[in-house]
Amino acid sequence: MRCLPVFVILLLLIASAPSVDARPKTKDDIPLVSFQDHAKRILQTFESRYDCCKTFECCHWG
């Protein structure tokens, strides 16, 4: 029970600390969202090609 007040104080200090990036942004930084969108697009392309090849209508990989 003696640890509980210390734990609460530490949580309050962590929550109130300012958010600072570990490294400054450069002009080449790309947001993570664009990587996720790109990955989704690639997966959708493979899925559409797989569906097409299941029916043997237009099986082309290129």
Swiss-Prot record:
The modification Tryptophan amide is found at residue 61. Contains 2 disulfide bonds that can be either 'C1-C3, C2-C4' or 'C1-C4, C2-C3', since these disulfide connectivities have been observed for conotoxins with cysteine framework V (for examples, see AC P0DQQ7 and AC P81755). It comes from the Eukaryota. One of its GO terms (cellular component) is extracellular region. It is found in: Secreted. GO terms for molecular function: toxin activity. Residues 23-48 form a propeptide. The cysteine framework is V (CC-CC). This is Conotoxin Pn-014. The lineage of its organism: Eukaryota, Metazoa, Spiralia, Lophotrochozoa, Mollusca.
